[in-house]
Amino acid sequence: MPEGRRAVYLNPGLIFGTGSHGTTRLCLEGVERYVRPGDRVLDLGTGSGILAIAALLLGAEQAVGCDIDPKAARVAAENASYNGVEGRFQVYTGDVNGDAELQQKLAGRYQVVLANIIADIIIPLTAAAGNYLAPGGTFLTSGIIDSRARDVAEALERNGFTIVETREREGWVSYAAQKK
């Protein structure tokens, strides 16, 4: 393993997020770039929890994940335990755009907000992501097929974000964006 890197141990079950898909790799590289020791991280659509767990292993103080799939929340919690970060990782089930109780649980500001989901979900999620972002924080998003990249970029801009980095791999796009 390259120096300075750490392994993330996973049992994804039937949940997305093993680290082998191009979108997950793009987001993991973004986590390496933008997460700093002591950060609070919010992972919207946490899946297996790989992104939040990686952030914790890189020094984030706390990570919170949420997913609409109860199985994903269970798998993410198990994976946090495999990696020894379960005490710093909370996982919730629900839709951040329509669940007031979940919105209260997620309340607070995060230095990094993650979303590795498809464009049709990211687009309406950009407003919520901005509400959780701390000043100077970064919204890292991937799962965007290149033919939908412009749509996501426009949604980010409409919701007060400036795209600070665009990365592409295998027909997928990832954005790092910050609030204006």
What role is predicted for each listed range?
Residues 1-3, 45-52, 98-99, 122-126:
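Short hydrophobic/aromatic-rich motifs at helix boundaries and adjacent loops
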Residues 1-5, 37, 103-106:
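Short, glycine- and charge-enriched coil/turn segments that flank and shape catalytic ligand pockets
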Residues 68-179:
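S-adenosylmethionine
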